């Protein structure tokens, strides 16, 4: 009888063990199989520089993120964390304040979007996090990234900027959003009108913090912080750290974890050139560059809104597809241009410095400073529109006699090398799949033989 009971017990134990083993095997299979069901974008096989590949080898799974968030990350095409993501995500997830310096185009947006989305509770119908950015275009871009990352999470994301109808924003914010991406003026307006209830907002992100703390937004961030709960978690990201950022840090951040990945300021994948030209030769030089370079997409910078429109008209007259964008345009028009250029509907975009902050168009491989900037910071952000996320690109500066001192000063301030444009620009420096013929190389002699071409753009 005892033997039968023991055998019966053994049989039950064995059966339970088999069932447990099968359940574990099923769970393991499920753990391994969810990735195979993802709708992944085509793999990006382009060469990447150490700006984004010099990591410790961590995987996104090691951050213990929700599976739904991981699904969004992988379906976005992000395979492994970049250095700034690897450094910032685990610290931000711990609840500490973060002060992060990293180059443009190395994954800063993901470095704060991922921990913010992970910490939001989808079951709570109130604003839990606020991301502030300096421009409307950057707000739209950031909100789109958050929406894509959160596609499998039940998190409601809202973008609010100036230039749009305030009534529409008020109606949307009453639909119980949990994450807001905003420009300073508009979110302050919503707070002052008692529409945006920030009493439960525990996370504040400041992207492009040096710009947010400039004279353009003087004092706005202090007003925003006054309307948040006491001691919110602050994640502060910037490529440059002027005195205003340091003062803000000392005033509002609590023992922040400092990350500095700025051993050098310029992206390793961007090769910089200059060409000495007369003002009246610039359009002809631009025409030469268009005809000789293998341009995927290009951004051409001018120093004033008037020159932006005039140059865009000249380029169109030369027979090239060209959009333009600047701060004085209607917001709806700006949104359309920004969207269509990102979709690749036009190869060339002429713009003012509106387009220098954080804007990510990965197809851009050529940046041209039609007008050379006066400030090193502006130059740094302009050329950072090419060579995004470790890819290759070139920056070409058209330098007049009056620009020569600014050229040498900026080169010295940034600790970088801006080379004279060579007789031949090697396509391997900026073309993903090099298949260049002789006609695809750019001759500096062509640039210098432009004295007979007027092509003048009035100031």
UniProtKB/Swiss-Prot annotation:
Coiled coil: none annotated. Keywords: ATP-binding, Cell projection, Cytoplasm, Endoplasmic reticulum, Helicase, Hydrolase, Methylation, Nucleotide-binding, Phosphoprotein, Repressor, RNA-binding, Translation regulation. Residues 432-459 are annotated as: RecA-like domain 2. Symmetrically dimethylated on arginine residues. Changing residue 285 to A: In CL-AA; reduced interaction with Gyf and Patr-1 but has no effect on interaction with 4E-T. GO terms for cellular component: cytoplasm; cytoplasmic ribonucleoprotein granule; cytoplasmic stress granule; endoplasmic reticulum; neuronal cell body; neuronal ribonucleoprotein granule; P granule; P-body. A motif (Q motif) lies at residues 58-86. Residues 264-431 are annotated as: Gyf binding. GO terms for biological process: deadenylation-dependent decapping of nuclear-transcribed mRNA; deadenylation-independent decapping of nuclear-transcribed mRNA; follicle cell of egg chamber development; habituation; miRNA-mediated gene silencing by inhibition of translation; miRNA-mediated post-transcriptional gene silencing; negative regulation of cytoplasmic translation; negative regulation of translation. It is found in: Cytoplasm; Cytoplasm, Cytoplasmic ribonucleoprotein granule; Cytoplasm, P-body; Endoplasmic reticulum. Residues 89-259 form the Helicase ATP-binding domain. Changing residue 281 to A: Abolishes interaction with Edc3. Changing residue 284 to A: Abolishes interaction with Edc3. This is ATP-dependent RNA helicase me31b. It comes from Drosophila melanogaster (Fruit fly).
């Amino acid at each position: 009888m005892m033997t039968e009971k023991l055998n019966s017990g053994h049989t039950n134990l064995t059966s339970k063990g088999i069932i447990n083993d099968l359940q574990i095997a099923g769970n393991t299979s499920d753990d391994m199989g969810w990735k195979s069901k993802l709708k992944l974008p085509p793999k990006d096989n382009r060469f990447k520089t150490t700006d984004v590949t010099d990591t410790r080898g961590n995987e996104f799974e090691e951050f213990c993120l929700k599976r739904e968030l991981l699904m969004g990350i992988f379906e976005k095409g992000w395979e492994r964390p970049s250095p700034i993501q690897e450094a910032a995500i685990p610290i931000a997830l711990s609840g500490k304040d973060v002060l992060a310096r990293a180059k443009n185009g190395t994954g800063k947006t993901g470095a704060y979007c991922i921990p913010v989305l992970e910490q939001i509770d989808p079951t709570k119908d109130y604003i839990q996090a606020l991301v502030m950015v300096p421009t409307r275009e950057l707000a739209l871009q950031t909100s789109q990234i958050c929406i894509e990352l959160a596609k499998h999470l039940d998190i409601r994301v809202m973008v609010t900027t100036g230039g749009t109808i305030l009534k529409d924003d008020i109606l949307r914010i009453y639909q119980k959003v949990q994450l807001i991406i905003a420009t300073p003026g508009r979110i302050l307006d919503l707070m002052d009108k008692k529409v945006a209830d920030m009493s439960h907002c525990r996370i504040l992100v400041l992207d492009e913090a040096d710009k947010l703390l400039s004279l353009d937004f003087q004092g706005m961030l202090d007003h925003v912080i006054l309307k948040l709960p006491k001691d919110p978690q602050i994640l502060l990201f910037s490529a440059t750290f002027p005195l205003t950022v340091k003062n803000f840090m000392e005033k509002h951040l609590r023992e922040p974890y400092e990350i500095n990945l700025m051993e050098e300021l310029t992206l390793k994948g961007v090769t910089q050139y200059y060409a000495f030209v007369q003002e009246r030769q610039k359009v002809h030089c631009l025409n030469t560059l268009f005809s000789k370079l293998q341009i995927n997409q290009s951004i051409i910078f001018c120093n004033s809104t008037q020159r932006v429109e005039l140059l865009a008209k000249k380029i169109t007259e030369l027979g090239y597809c060209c959009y333009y964008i600047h701060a004085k345009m209607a917001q709806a028009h700006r949104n359309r241009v920004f969207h269509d250029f990102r979709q690749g509907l036009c190869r060339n975009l002429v713009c003012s410095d509106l387009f220098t902050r954080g804007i990510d168009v990965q197809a851009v491989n050529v940046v041209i400073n039609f007008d050379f900037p006066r400030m090193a910071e502006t130059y740094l952000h302009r050329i950072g529109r090419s060579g995004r996320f470790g890819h290759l690109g070139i920056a070409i500066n058209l330098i007049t006699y009056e620009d020569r001192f600014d050229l040498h000063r900026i080169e010295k301030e940034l600790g970088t090398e801006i080379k004279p444009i060579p007789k031949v620009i090697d396509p391997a420096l900026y073309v993903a799949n090099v298949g260049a013929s002789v006609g695809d190389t750019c001759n500096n002699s062509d640039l210098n033989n432009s004295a007979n071409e007027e092509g003048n753009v009035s100031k």
